[in-house]
Amino acid sequence: MTKKILIITDNLVDQINGVVTTYKNIEPYAARDGYSIDYINPGRYRYVDCPKYNEVKLAYPKDLDKTIQEIHPDHIHIATEGFLGLFARRYLTIHRINYNTAYHTKFPEAIKKLFGVPETFTWPMIRWFHSNSNAVLTTTKSMVEELKSHGFGNNIVTWTRGVDREIFKPTERKVNEKLVLLNVGRVSKEKNLEQFYKMNYPNCQKIQVGDGPMLKEYIKRYPDVNFVGTKCSAELAHYYQQADVFVFPSRWDTFGLVMIEAMACGTPVAAYPVQGPIDVIDNDITGVMDANLSTAIKKALDLDRENVYNKSIKWSWERAWEIFRGNLRSSK
């Protein structure tokens, strides 16, 4: 008999980000092992974009209790700390129903960057949100330690990520007249992209793949950057494959799925030595971390692309599914 997993998320299923990508990529393995995945997301309700952070949708789920009862899931997972997550937490706690949660995004840091709200205010809220979860799944060992340092319990689990190797793989590359420096992701303030755009690196072409709330502003502000919009599947892989270095300037990501997509294509990564990169990059093998991004790029150019690819093989969506499945608890 097929077992039902219910995932409650404040992201729409067609959004392009690391959270949505993660759940989409474990679905085939869930189906293989006799599980089906249902979603409660803002698409079921009327919603508005969160100001300054339109990745998060604000929906009022007036019939969420009824929806959960109708789905009658065997397991429940709350993916995000938004409105839907809050309403689900309330219902599940009142009825003493088991569930687990995920910590995907460094919200305290992002909220401080976007709205100026002190982290001393948001960390207690995040800790409270996850306090009744049977297991808190987060991206890396360093994130586990950070959550513990903010008062989380011992039920935190490292939930690794993967990459679709049918799409993201090395290919024959053309010789670029200029160095191609690439970033892929949400075009927004908290991604720290201006450190990449402002960088005065010689004889290079900077390419930005992705959309976001700051896209129009950055197009005006940085005419030398080639903004190409959202790309998916083979078209996205082509940008990774043809880039000389993937530049990851973010200081607030818990992981950075785009880094391992780049590595799977053989493209080395240049990044700051912060959470996310320190857990993903094998320094001086798959990329270079340095407090000076230009220095990181210069050193990354000397790395062997075959070694970059070979080291990336450890990232597997099947392994990600196994960890997710192993931390499910019965909701009945």
Where do the language-model regions lie?
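Donor nucleotide-sugar binding/catalytic pocket of nucleotide-sugar-dependent glycosyltransferases
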Residues: P124-P170
